[in-house]
Design a protein with these regions (language model features):
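Flexible glycine/proline-rich
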Residues: 15-155
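Glycine-rich beta-strand-to-loop/alpha-helix junction loops that act as flexible
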Residues: 1-15, 50-51
Length: 155
């Protein structure tokens, strides 16, 4: 949808208020993708995706897909693990980073050309390493989320 953050050009919240929506999720502590929104009007769920393409993809994979799976009775599965091929420094904000990268010989590495507004990097990736605020050291095992198209093509 876009418009889910709190900038002067973000109008989703005002529209939801005008419709009498109840906000359930008003952003999450994750990057990219933090301005996700989940609301309800009566019993109708509404999902607000961030406007940046990589952030919107993250919101689909981490919020929308698990929600739809739960509605259909699909059981939540534990995340796979990847071993980090490089040190990832601690982050100055209390949030989780989803690092776009690729599993290679020697471990998981971040791909180049990554920002929430770009899809070029994710096109070369096979998933996200889940990195908490403390960062990760080379050799650490961390949770891993595969990109949707890798799940389909690897079967």
């Amino acid at each position: 949808t876009g418009g889910t953050a709190r900038g002067h050009r973000d109008f989703l919240r005002a529209a939801l208020d005008a419709l009498g929506a109840r906000i359930i999720v008003d952003g999450v502590a994750v990057r990219p993708g933090h301005p996700m929104t989940l609301a309800k009007i009566g019993e109708i769920p509404l999902v607000g995706l961030p406007g940046n393409p990589l952030s919107a993809l993250v919101a689909m994979v981490t919020l929308v897909e698990p929600m739809v799976d739960a509605w259909h009775g699909r059981i939540e599965r534990d995340l796979a693990q990847v071993v980090m091929a490089e040190d990832i420094p601690a982050f100055h904000k209390p949030l989780t980073r989803l690092m776009v990268g690729r599993r290679e010989l020697g471990g998981f590495r971040q791909v180049a050309l990554v920002s929430s507004a770009m899809l070029r990097g994710i096109a070369h990736a096979d998933g996200w390493a889940v990195i908490d605020q403390e960062g990760a050291r080379k050799g650490d095992a961390v949770p891993w989320i595969p990109v949707p198209w890798r799940r389909v093509t690897s079967r």
